[in-house]
């Protein structure tokens, strides 16, 4: 068995595709209408489709998981994030852990938690 993808729920799939391309360089590989596979194994699922599958509500900002990215030039990434998406809601600003790794945590446009850190 092999883990193939990670799926996150989004309200506007086109807006989210642009967001993940702008910030992380992810490209669309397949558009299934309401479900979109991006490079690096990230899948965007429209909220209404997901609600139909689950037959229930989607819990935003649940902090049960996060998408983790690594970026050696993290200060440049933070500048880009602030320039392109100034309304970003931060969980924590750029911080340095005791072991020397720099990280930042924030929510995407739909409340999915993202962490960006320098390589360990």
Sequence positions of predicted segments:
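A generic "structured core" feature
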Residues: 17, 36-37, 45, 88-91
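N-terminal beta-strand motif that seeds the catalytic metal site of vicinal oxygen chelate
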Residues: 1-15, 65-67
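Vicinal oxygen chelate
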Residues: 13, 67-113
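Amphipathic alpha-helical segments
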Residues: 14-26
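Short beta-strand-to-loop elements that line the ligand-binding cleft
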Residues: 8, 29, 92-96
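Conserved short beta-strand elements that form part of the metal-binding/catalytic scaffold
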Residues: 27-62, 113-118
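Short glycine-enriched loop/turn motifs at secondary-structure junctions
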Residues: 1-3, 59-64, 97-98
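Short secondary-structure junctions
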Residues: 25-31, 87-91
């Amino acid at each position: 068995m092999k883990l193939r993808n990670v799926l996150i729920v989004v309200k506007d799939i086109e807006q989210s595709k642009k967001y993940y391309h702008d910030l992380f360089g992810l490209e669309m590989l397949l558009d299934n209408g309401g479900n979109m596979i991006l490079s690096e194994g990230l899948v965007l699922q429209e909220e209404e489709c997901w609600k139909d599958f689950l037959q229930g509500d989607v819990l935003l900002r649940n902090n049960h998981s996060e998408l983790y990215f690594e970026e050696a030039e993290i200060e440049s990434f933070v500048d880009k994030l602030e320039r392109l998406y100034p309304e970003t809601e931060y969980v924590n600003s750029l911080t340095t852990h005791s072991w020397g790794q720099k990280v930042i945590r924030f929510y995407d446009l739909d409340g999915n938690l993202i962490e960006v850190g320098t390589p360990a």
